[in-house]
């Protein structure tokens, strides 16, 4: 008997809940010291992108569902974390595939610079995953808290690390984006919040002794998204291996910057397999 696809589901997402002392948030990864409260959980209705009309697009909304058939096998993805040869293969083959899909959906792209590749896998159930958010071992786990990968200062930092300060200054004169190709996710659409920007809707968690620098480059703080009742929540049901979501995890025009998060879907069976995802981040200039 066929099962109907629901246009929406209900789930839980974590959002910024401030600090214990009212000051800027910090996390010391060496000692575990922090003043950041655990993310506050909100029950949300999440609408299926497949059922939306019109469909969201990268150029209009900052995110888009696309097909990206790949020649890379699951074994080759796994090997990327085990050997330099495996890592080099991903950079040579998969990065080229991701660049091509960004060119197709973005249009008018001047420069695309892939900067990172990561595989994430959930280890354990909801409670343990949430509790481990600040732990070193959670660095490759899904992030069940709404966030942005970068804002303007931290995007400039990774650009300078990648191409050098002189080349960075040349590129900074152009419109810049940080698209990621990733699955599975919940997007926080803020089309109904015309004043949305990094200053009003993002809390900072300053990092000390951060082990993630080797994976993602220097980032002085993480950007955790604040609650706003005007958000619309979107996801993709039954995402297939040949599909992915291209979105702007940072954009120099805040309208296109897309807050995102793993979320806990109440309709997922208790014995469902752990959440897994593959992501590539690129710096894109127009």
UniProtKB/Swiss-Prot annotation:
Its EC number is 1.-.-.-. InterPro entries: AsaB-like. The keyword Oxidoreductase applies. Keywords: Oxidoreductase. One of its GO terms (molecular function) is oxidoreductase activity. Pathway: Secondary metabolite biosynthesis. Belongs to the asaB hydroxylase/desaturase family. Oxidoreductase; part of the gene cluster that mediates the biosynthesis of squalestatin S1 (SQS1, also known as zaragozic acid A), a heavily oxidized fungal polyketide that offers potent cholesterol lowering activity by targeting squalene synthase (SS). SQS1 is composed of a 2,8-dioxobicyclic[3.2.1]octane-3,4,5-tricarboxyclic acid core that is connected to two lipophilic polyketide arms. PANTHER family: BLL6449 PROTEIN (PTHR34598), OXIDOREDUCTASE AN1597 (PTHR34598:SF3). This is Oxidoreductase clz15.
């Amino acid at each position: 008997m066929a099962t109907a696809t629901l246009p929406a589901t209900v789930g839980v997402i974590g959002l910024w809940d401030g600090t214990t002392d009212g000051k800027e948030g910090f996390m010391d990864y060496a000692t575990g010291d922090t003043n950041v409260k655990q993310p506050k959980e909100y029950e949300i209705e999440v609408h299926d992108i497949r059922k939306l009309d019109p469909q969201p697009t990268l150029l209009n909304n900052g995110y888009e569902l696309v097909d990206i058939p790949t020649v890379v096998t699951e074994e080759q993805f796994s090997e990327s974390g085990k050997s330099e040869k495996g890592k080099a293969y991903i950079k040579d083959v998969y990065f080229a595939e991701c660049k091509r899909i960004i060119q197709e959906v973005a249009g008018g792209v001047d420069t695309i610079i892939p900067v990172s590749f990561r595989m994430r896998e959930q280890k354990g159930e909801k409670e343990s995953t949430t509790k481990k958010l600040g732990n070193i071992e959670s660095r490759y786990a899904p992030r069940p808290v709404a966030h942005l990968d970068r804002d303007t200062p931290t995007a400039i930092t990774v650009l300078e690390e990648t191409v050098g300060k002189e080349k960075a200054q040349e590129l900074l004169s152009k419109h810049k984006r940080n698209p990621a190709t990733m699955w599975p996710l919940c997007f926080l659409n803020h089309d109904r919040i015309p004043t949305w920007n990094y200053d009003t809707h993002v809390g900072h968690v300053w990092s000390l002794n951060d082990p993630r620098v080797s994976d993602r480059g220097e980032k002085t703080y993480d950007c955790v998204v604040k609650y706003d009742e005007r958000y619309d929540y979107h996801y993709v049901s039954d995402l297939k291996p040949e599909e992915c979501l291209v979105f702007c995890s940072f954009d120099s025009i805040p309208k296109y910057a897309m807050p995102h998060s793993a979320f806990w879907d109440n309709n997922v069976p208790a014995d469902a397999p752990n959440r897994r995802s593959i992501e590539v981040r690129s710096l894109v200039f127009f």
